[in-house]
């Protein structure tokens, strides 16, 4: 499940090349059409119709186009969540059961807030201590986490600005930096 097509979110795709060998089928990918276009362009060799030279030569991928409607993956309902990654770019977060994953965001649109209620776990972007144009900074992320009210919040997509131990020691109860 892809959130968006930035390099730090799709460039590891080639590392999946052996997974189809063990799975016995192509690796299913779930993404919006714009992300699919970026994947097909960036990893064109993975979609080449010529036979591969050996089992791990190229990743075998099966792309499933999604939007913000709920879908079922491996018997579990997944709800894609619309998020803003700066003023002009939209990405997806995901809610799976009582867990929500919301990274690369600095704004949660009004229509997404109701889907963040009743969470056990919130995984939320908190890039650094200083404000950023396209990511929540830590203070913004704490405010969002408090508004969501999940039992536990893990901050992710962290820069090297943080002293892990010192920052965790100063966070509100139920909130911590992820690794």
Residue ranges and their predicted role:
Residues 1-102, 111, 168-179:
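Binuclear metal-dependent hydrolase catalytic cores
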Residues 107-179:
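Cap/insert and terminal regions of metallo-dependent hydrolase folds
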